[in-house]
């Protein structure tokens, strides 16, 4: 990969991270259940990506059984990831949800060698632990059994499913277009979550519907497609550590848009996460393909 291509991939990845960071704001902005928010975003993401693929005259389904099964599995993982992510935000706080989710670089560093012919380098382990330390500083004192503790557990499970979804997509689906990959994952998640309509009424007010459309099309379909496109060009551990910037983006967005002022924990933890991300960025640009 040329230096120009690396820079383009890096910028696309960071823009995707900025957009995905905005997802957590919708947990506060949309007055609906976690299940309905997740179902709504998957439906509108699927519709948006389907129309895009048809407009570009691209296929919407894969031709091989293996790819379709992999896409189904990735879609299930994505649905669980989104549900547990928003549940973490509701149980604890948006900040805790984002920060526990971004233990996923640590998880990725240890999962990737299991499925790919590679071994984690000492630098990878150091950066992963640095990210974990940064996240640990950001999280206040725990008391098992309370909402904060349950929110953190939910966030950690969300991190695991996110890491495994990325691994499945990278290993089995990276030879396909990112929009097609994301469409099938979103469609699978939407079908899986459809039963929520039996116990949770579909919102009828324009505000909730409008925010769900925005979340599903721009902050999910577009953002995650761009993320997948960039991720396919990177090593999973590199993508994981570079994405550690997302908690910082989320804290800044919450500060600017919701008035949530970061405390000293957020500042110190954010600096450590930024430091790890900066080191990985320098390594990424120096790597020889």
What function would you assign to each model-found segment?
Residues 1-40, 47, 73-76, 84, ...:
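Glycine-/small-residue-enriched transmembrane alpha-helix faces in small-molecule transporters
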Residues 6-9, 31-39, 62-68, 140-161, ...:
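Juxtamembrane helix-entry segments on the extracytoplasmic side of multipass membrane proteins
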Residues 30, 37, 41, 88, ...:
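Hydrophobic/aromatic residues within transmembrane alpha-helices
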Residues 36, 43-44, 86-119, 158, ...:
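Specific alpha-helical transmembrane segments that line the substrate/conduction pathway
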Residues 50, 56-95, 101, 137, ...:
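Specific transmembrane alpha-helical segments of multi-pass solute transporters/efflux pumps
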